[in-house]
Amino acid sequence: MSVTKKDVAYIAELARLKFGDTEMETMTVELNNILHYIDKLNEVDTEGVQPLSSIHDESNVLRADIEKTSISTDQVLLNAPDRQDRFFKVPKVIG
């Protein structure tokens, strides 16, 4: 498969890009080089190779969801340099 300047112009339009003549030529050559490189994958012998969707056997390995005791809000707020009611008070950062 090869890419023409018309293909690159169409892709550029979809991506809302504008290329000059030199850039259009460069992009056409580069995309053709990339596709040629990717096409080499068709030469790989995959006979007898099982398809896989991940290199890892396990998926979504999560720790057990165990309820633990934690410190109270009042204890947390004891470490706050400044507070208002039950909240940390911080300097305003948005004008």
Swiss-Prot record:
EC numbers, comma separated: 6.3.5.-
Membrane in keyword set: no
InterPro entries named among the record's database cross-references: Asp/Glu-ADT_sf_sub_c (IPR036113), GatC (IPR003837)
Reactions listed under catalytic activity: L-glutamyl-tRNA(Gln) + L-glutamine + ATP + H2O = L-glutaminyl-tRNA(Gln) + L-glutamate + ADP + phosphate + H(+); L-aspartyl-tRNA(Asn) + L-glutamine + ATP + H2O = L-asparaginyl-tRNA(Asn) + L-glutamate + ADP + phosphate + 2 H(+)
One of the protein's GO biological processes: glutaminyl-tRNAGln biosynthesis via transamidation
Alphabetized GO MF terms: asparaginyl-tRNA synthase (glutamine-hydrolyzing) activity; ATP binding; glutaminyl-tRNA synthase (glutamine-hydrolyzing) activity
Gene3D superfamilies with a match to the protein in the record: Glu-tRNAGln amidotransferase C subunit, N-terminal domain (1.10.20.60)
Alphabetized SUPFAM superfamilies for the sequence: Glu-tRNAGln amidotransferase C subunit
Keywords recorded for this protein, A-Z: ATP-binding, Ligase, Nucleotide-binding, Protein biosynthesis
Segments forming a coiled coil: none
Functional summary from the UniProt entry: Allows the formation of correctly charged Asn-tRNA(Asn) or Gln-tRNA(Gln) through the transamidation of misacylated Asp-tRNA(Asn) or Glu-tRNA(Gln) in organisms which lack either or both of asparaginyl-tRNA or glutaminyl-tRNA synthetases. The reaction takes place in the presence of glutamine and ATP through an activated phospho-Asp-tRNA(Asn) or phospho-Glu-tRNA(Gln).
Subunit relationships: Heterotrimer of A, B and C subunits.
Family from the record: Belongs to the GatC family.
Protein name: Aspartyl/glutamyl-tRNA(Asn/Gln) amidotransferase subunit C
Encoding gene (name): gatC
